[in-house]
């Protein structure tokens, strides 16, 4: 299972990659494997301020519907529409969701947040790739 070492992970299977004060967020390959075919992915609108742990969006699949949680606090500044991610309340038709499945850690990112808090405290309780792999081996 692919778990890149250049980002942080949550117990709910989101990943975050930090680039200066920006946080690129997606879901892990493990989450995708558990979900099955992704049919819809909706996130809060651009400009929304969101706190760490709050619901960022929802992903629907052939098996279930799951919430996506914000691993850090910030303002949504970018939404990956190229991968079929749509804004909450939008009438857009999702096109390109397969990119999230095929390349969840690069092309398949979901949103970018501009981090609004102290970055080190925002990252404090997130897992490294090694810790995330241990978490998965423990059956989570």
Swiss-Prot record:
GO biological process terms, semicolon-separated: glycine decarboxylation via glycine cleavage system
Domain Lipoyl-binding, residue spans: 22-114
Keyword annotations of the record: Lipoyl
Keyword rRNA processing: no
Note on how the cofactor is bound: Binds 1 lipoyl cofactor covalently.
Domain of life: Archaea
Family in the record: Belongs to the GcvH family.
NCBIfam families registered for this protein in UniProt: PRK01202.1
Role: The glycine cleavage system catalyzes the degradation of glycine. The H protein shuttles the methylamine group of glycine from the P protein to the T protein.
Quaternary structure and partners: The glycine cleavage system is composed of four proteins: P, T, L and H.
Protein name (database record): Probable glycine cleavage system H protein
Species, as recorded: Korarchaeum cryptofilum (strain OPF8)
């Amino acid at each position: 299972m692919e778990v890149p070492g250049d980002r942080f992970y949550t117990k709910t299977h989101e990943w975050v990659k930090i680039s200066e004060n920006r946080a690129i967020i997606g879901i892990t390959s493990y989450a995708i494997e558990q979900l099955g075919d992704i049919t819809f992915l909706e996130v809060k609108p651009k400009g929304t301020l969101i706190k760490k742990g709050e619901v960022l969006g929802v992903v629907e699949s052939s098996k279930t519907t799951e919430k996506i949680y914000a691993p850090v606090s910030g303002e949504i500044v970018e939404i990956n529409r190229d991968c079929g991610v749509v804004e909450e309340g939008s009438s857009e038709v999702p096109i390109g969701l397969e990119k999230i499945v095929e390349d969840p850690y690069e092309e398949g990112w979901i949103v970018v947040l501009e981090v609004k808090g102290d970055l080190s405290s925002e990252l404090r309780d997130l897992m490294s790739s090694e810790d995330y792999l241990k978490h998965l081996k423990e059956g989570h």
